[in-house]
Amino acid sequence: MLRVHELDKKMSGEDRFHLENISFHLPKGYICGLVGENGAGKTTLLRCLMGLYRSTGDIVIDGHNLNSDEAAAREVIAVVGDEGFFDENINLEKLGKYYGQMYVRFDMEKYLGYLERFNLDRKQKYKKLSKGMKIKAQLAFALSYGAKLFLFDEPTAGLDKHFREDFLRLCTELVSDGGKSIIISSHITEDLDRIADYIAYMQAGRLLFFKPKDAACGHFRIVTGPVYKCKLIPREAVVYMEEGTYSSTAMVIRDKCILVDRELQEHTPDIRELIHYLVKGGKENAENIVEKYFG
């Protein structure tokens, strides 16, 4: 579905941000969670994938190279985010008629059908919609021209739990036919824990790893117990340990640490814990620790 090879983008301006040598492959039918701290380069990467920023390297979407076959590539990309790209002052029906002309395979009947399915009034002006309703309207439009790659930038930020549940269900439905893929950039890692198949972790403009979520998280264990017990864990197994007054918590390499002590409790890290301890273990530079443990 999506192949990115040696993508490189140098931004102008005071910060001169550099998106450096990004390569990964997201197969059809899968969801990727894009994570990293603010300023890591997530939005810049998404804008390169959208074609909003020109970059060197190759971006191939459903067989179409974004640099050499941009028109065909854009036909299969859907951008769903906080701001949107639609005229705020027209209603949803007119929105479909106007913007649908830009896509060869746009189907107005499908679009109206999705509006009905998402409980959206076709006569409602776009600017009158809530953030959650705007996301549904954008999805309805994208599904109506046959988009294959869906790019979401912080789609559930600031939204209530009910909409988040609805959104996660929609995402799993989107990829269920095996023909579509999704990249979600989000700080709400508990959402990604539930639906992401892959994790892409960025830091300072570099993609430090792109791994299947279960494999990445399953490579480690979070261990909690009395301070003196945790200190007995072999040093070569410890990625990072946080010591408290009476108890400590550490992330350890699963294959290098077999625990039999009942005073030590363990669980598989979630995405938030994984990133937290990788960063801490790398002394605020996760690149070293990632290369050490993931190769």
Identify the residue ranges that each predicted region occupies.
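Helix-to-loop junction immediately C-terminal to a conserved catalytic motif
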Residues: 50
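Catalytic Walker B motif of ABC-type/P-loop ATPase nucleotide-binding domains
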Residues: 150-154
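Conserved ABC transporter NBD signature motif
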Residues: 57-68, 72-73
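ABC transporter nucleotide-binding domain
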Residues: 168-252
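Short loop immediately C-terminal to the Walker-B catalytic DE motif
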Residues: 156-157, 189
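ABC-family P-loop ATPase nucleotide-binding domains
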Residues: 75, 81-138
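The feature captures the beta-strand-to-loop junction immediately N-terminal to the Walker
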Residues: 35-37
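A short, flexible loop at the N-terminus of ABC-type nucleotide-binding domains that lies
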Residues: 1-21, 28, 70
